[in-house]
Regions:
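Carbohydrate-active catalytic/glycan-binding domains of CAZyme proteins
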Residues: 1-487, 493-554
Length: 554
C-alpha cells in the first residue's frame, strides 16, 4: 500500500471482524453504522466514523432483548437480523426483523440515545431485513422487507408496504414488488436497502447466498413497481467471495460509497468499503443479460434508462483504493483491550443472553469480577447465558488475560474461551480438595459435552495468565503461565518475559468454527455446578489482543 500523502489509500476490509449485515448513513460530517447482533446483549451496535475507513464503537441501541423470557438462554440465530439505520425528522431510526416475531423499530434524538423501547411495527413469522423510506418528494413513507423460509416457507422475494409517517405501523398487507423466482439465476434474494435517487425508487439487495452471492440493484419510477434489475457487484476474479449486502452513502462533496460484508468462515462477516458512481448503464450483468422487469405483477416493462450504480472496479470488489474525499482522521478501530475499570466491561463486550443481576460485581478497583453462576449446563458453554463475549479479530492475533479464581466451592471454574459450533477454553477449576488446577477443555460440533484437551495441572495461588494464539486459518493454540517455576516441561519461549515460568503450550491446535450466521467469539466465563449458596467469584484483569501481522496504514 502506498504511503504517499499525495495518494492516500485504504485497504479492505475496513472493519476486520464480524460486523454482520452493515447499514450506514451520514448526518452532517459524521457517518454511522449498525449491524446484526442476533441473540447477543446489548444489541444493535452503533459505530461512528468521520472518513468511512476508521470506525469506533460508540454504543448500542438495544439494551435488552424482548420478550425477556425468550432470551433468558442463548438463541444464537434469533433476535436482531439485518437492521436498517436512517435519520429522519431530527431522529435516528433503526428497523430490524426478528424472524420469529416481526418487524421492530427503535428511535432516538442522538446516536448515543436515549433510545426508545422496541416497538412492534408488524407482527409475523419470517419478516426479515426491513428498510424504511420517507419520500420527501411525495410525503409518503414506505417499507420493504425480505422473507426467511425457515419461519414462513417463503423466500427469494421482496414485499413492499406503505408505512405510517410516524414509523409506527404499516398501512396495508403488502405487495410482492420483486419476485426473485421470476429472474433467471436469482435465488435467496434478501437484505434490501431502499433509497430515492434521480426520480427513481432504488432497492439495493443481495442474492445468491451468504458465501457466494452478489449485489443487485433494482429501480422503478413507482414504489410498487415494476422494477428492473442489474448485478452491480460480484466476486469476478478477486479473492472476495460473496461481496454483498450493505448500504450506500454519499459524502458532503458528492462522492458515493458502498459498505458491504464478506463471509470469512470463523471470522464472520467482515466489512469492505467500495467506491461507487452512477453511470449510464453501468454495473455488471450475469448470463441473463440486460436490465429486465422483475415485478411480480408488473403489467408491463419498467422504463429503461441510464444511471445505474457502478460499484468497486467496474463491478468487482477492490482490495485497496484511494481514500474518500474527507478530512484525514487518526487510525481508529473498535476497542478490544480492557482493564475493566470499576469492574465494568467495555462496550465491546456482549452477553450471550439477557444478563441477570449479580453476574458481574462493580467495585472500586480494576478487573472484571464474575460470579461463578450455578448451572446444570456446566458441561457445555454453548448453552450458558452468562458468557461475556467479543468478536474474534479477522487477522492473526494473540489474546491474553489474567485470571484469579477467588474463594469458592469445589467445581467452581472460570476461563477464556473461543466459542462457536465447536469450542475450547482454558482456565482454572477448584478441585474436591480445595486446590486450584489449570484445566483445558473442548467440545466438538456434534458433541453435547466437553472433555479434556490436556491433563489438569497445578495452579499455585489460584492464578494464571491465559493465552490464545490465533493464526490466519483461525487455528488456535492455547497456552498458560501459572508462575510455577517447578513446571518447566514444554515451556514455550515467548520472549516476552511473561511470568517466571513463561508460557506453556496446552493441548492440540483447535480450529475455531462459526455459529449459525455468527462468527466465532472470544468469551470470558465463570460457572459452578448446581447446588446451594454462593459458589465463589473469578476476577479477570488486563485483557489484551495483540495483532501479530501489522497492516499498512489504514
Amino acid at each position: 500500500m502506498s504511503a504517499d500523502p499525495a495518494e492516500p489509500v485504504y485497504r479492505n476490509p475496513v472493519l476486520d471482524a464480524d460486523w454482520s449485515d452493515p447499514d450506514v448513513i451520514r448526518v452532517g460530517d459524521d457517518f454511522y453504522l449498525t449491524a446484526s447482533s442476533f441473540g447477543r446483549v446489548p444489541g444493535l451496535p452503533l459505530l461512528h466514523s468521520r472518513d468511512l475507513v476508521n470506525w469506533t464503537l460508540v454504543g448500542h441501541a438495544l439494551q435488552r432483548l424482548e420478550p425477556e423470557s425468550e432470551f433468558a438462554a442463548p438463541r444464537h440465530d434469533c433476535g436482531v437480523w439485518a437492521p436498517s439505520l436512517r435519520h429522519h425528522d431530527g431522529r435516528f431510526w433503526i428497523f430490524w426483523g426478528d424472524p420469529d416475531r416481526g418487524v421492530f423499530q427503535v428511535n432516538a434524538p442522538e446516536i448515543r440515545g436515549p433510545w426508545t423501547r422496541p416497538h412492534l411495527v408488524k407482527a409475523g413469522k419470517g419478516l426479515i431485513d426491513p428498510c424504511p423510506l420517507w419520500d420527501d418528494e411525495t410525503g409518503e413513507a414506505y417499507l420493504v422487507h425480505a422473507w426467511a423460509k425457515s419461519r414462513s416457507g417463503v423466500k427469494n422475494r421482496l414485499t413492499g408496504h406503505r408505512m405510517h409517517p410516524h414509523g409506527t405501523e404499516l398501512l396495508d398487507e403488502g405487495k410482492v414488488i420483486v419476485d426473485g423466482d421470476r429472474i433467471p439465476g436469482w435465488f435467496t434474494l434478501e437484505g434490501p436497502k431502499l433509497y430515492r435517487h434521480d426520480g427513481w425508487f432504488w432497492i439495493f439487495a443481495p442474492a445468491g447466498g451468504v458465501e457466494t452471492g452478489w449485489q443487485g440493484a433494482f429501480r422503478s419510477r413507482a414504489f410498487f413497481g415494476p422494477y428492473e434489475e442489474k448485478v452491480v457487484l460480484e466476486q469476478k476474479d478477486t479473492d472476495v467471495n460473496g461481496p454483498h449486502q450493505g448500504g450506500w452513502v454519499r459524502t458532503p462533496s458528492g462522492e458515493d460509497w458502498f459498505l458491504h460484508f464478506q463471509q470469512r468462515g470463523a471470522y464472520g462477516r467482515v466489512v469492505h468499503l467500495q467506491p461507487m458512481r452512477w453511470g449510464g448503464g453501468g454495473g455488471t450483468s450475469r448470463s441473463w443479460g440486460s436490465p429486465r422487469s422483475s415485478g411480480a405483477e408488473s403489467g408491463g416493462e419498467a422504463e429503461s434508462g441510464g444511471g445505474w450504480p457502478v460499484i468497486g472496479d467496474d463491478g468487482a470488489p477492490v482490495a485497496e483504493h484511494r481514500r474518500p474525499d474527507l478530512p484525514p482522521q487518526p487510525p481508529a478501530a473498535p476497542a478490544t483491550d480492557d482493564d475493566f475499570p470499576g469492574g465494568r466491561p467495555g462496550r465491546q463486550w456482549q452477553w450471550t443472553a439477557n444478563p441477570r443481576d449479580g453476574w458481574a460485581t462493580h467495585h472500586s478497583a480494576d478487573g472484571l469480577r464474575l460470579t461463578c453462576v450455578r448451572t446444570p449446563d456446566a458441561h457445555d458453554l454453548r448453552a450458558l447465558p452468562n458468557v461475556l463475549t467479543q468478536r474474534l479479530p479477522g487477522t492473526p492475533c494473540t489474546v491474553e488475560v489474567d485470571l484469579r479464581l477467588d474463594d469458592g466451592e469445589p467445581g467452581a471454574r472460570a476461563g477464556l474461551a473461543v466459542l462457536g459450533d465447536a469450542y475450547s477454553w482454558i482456565g482454572l477449576q477448584r478441585g474436591p480438595d480445595g486446590t486450584v488446577r489449570l484445566v483445558h477443555r473442548f467440545a466438538e460440533t456434534v458433541a453435547d459435552q466437553e472433555r479434556d484437551a490436556a491433563p489438569p495441572r497445578p495452579a499455585p495461588g489460584g492464578r494464571a495468565r491465559l493465552r490464545v494464539d490465533i493464526d490466519a486459518g483461525a487455528r488456535c493454540r492455547f497456552s498458560y503461565d501459572t508462575g510455577d517455576t517447578g513446571d518447566t516441561a514444554n515451556t514455550a519461549d515467548t520472549g516476552d518475559g511473561a511470568g517466571q515460568g513463561g508460557f506453556r503450550p496446552s493441548g492440540q491446535v483447535f480450529a475455531a468454527t462459526p455459529w449459525r450466521w455468527v462468527g466465532a467469539l472470544l468469551g470470558l466465563v465463570a460457572l459452578a455446578p448446581t447446588g446451594q449458596g454462593h459458589a465463589g467469584t473469578a476476577t479477570f484483569t488486563q485483557f489484551r489482543i495483540r495483532i501479530q501481522e501489522k497492516r499498512a496504514d489504514r
